């Protein structure tokens, strides 16, 4: 059994990561528009995703589509495909809702607006049942968020 230095291991892992990177898409990523939850600009997120060789990146800011225009513009000329979604606080925790195409974007936009109108500034109120009705068949829901129900 031969020994390897940490640098050799890092090079090997890095090489393998690059082999498989195109098969991976990050589906839960918050930008600086998610106050106290995200730090990087949408442009920087796209830049790093490209450096890592990700095939796609979902921008899922809390309770809104705040960074999607800048995100889409930054990704336009890169190989990184964009996915739009939002992290939503409702019921027993946070869920991530990802739009399935343009009709999903519209449905999720309406659901986000509903929650914002039900609550107050910076305190939206999302009802699980009405959210489910709004996005049913138009979006994917991930329940394993950091503070999610699973």
Residue ranges of predicted features:
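Phosphodiester-processing cores and adjacent nucleic acid-binding clamps
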Residues: 1-150
């Amino acid at each position: 059994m031969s020994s390897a230095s940490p640098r050799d291991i890092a090079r090997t892992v890095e090489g393998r990561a690059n082999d498989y990177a195109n098969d991976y898409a990050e589906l839960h990523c918050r930008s600086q528009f998610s106050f106290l939850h995200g730090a990087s600009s949408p442009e920087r997120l796209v830049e790093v995703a490209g450096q890592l060789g990700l095939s796609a990146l979902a921008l899922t800011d809390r309770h809104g589509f705040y960074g999607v225009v800048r995100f889409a513009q930054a990704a336009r000329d890169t190989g990184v495909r964009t996915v739009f979604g939002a992290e939503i606080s409702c019921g027993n925790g946070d869920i991530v809702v990802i739009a399935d195409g343009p009709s999903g974007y519209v449905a999720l936009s309406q659901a986000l607006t509903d929650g914002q109108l039900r609550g107050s500034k910076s305190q939206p109120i999302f009802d699980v049942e009405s959210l489910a009705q709004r996005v049913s068949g138009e979006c994917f829901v991930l329940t394993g968020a950091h503070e999610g129900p699973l």
